[in-house]
Amino acid sequence: MKTWMCALMLALSTGASAQNPIISGQYSADPTARVFNGKVYLYPSHDIPSPIEKLKEWFCMADYHVFSSSNLTEWQDHGVIVSQDKVPWVQDGSYTMWAPDC
């Protein structure tokens, strides 16, 4: 019975797929969501390819984007809202703009 149940769970998990990705065409992580005036705003970290060889195996986050939706189906990318050169506590060129809610 235990083997059968494990096989069933494995089979069900492999068929799952996302039908409405919020963010496509870029890497993101650590999202924070807020609701203002009936609209959901999503603030994720924005991961980019590293311009510095030593950071190739690490995250590289120089800015934050914001996305919004009034129906949770259609999302609008508002682009970069802040970058590392505008934040006094971020060392320029460190690419450490992660976890927007911290």
Residue ranges and their predicted role:
Residues 16-102:
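Carbohydrate-active catalytic/glycan-binding domains of CAZyme proteins
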Residues 3-15:
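Sec-dependent N-terminal signal peptides
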Residues 2-3, 77:
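Solvent-exposed, well-ordered amphipathic alpha-helical segments
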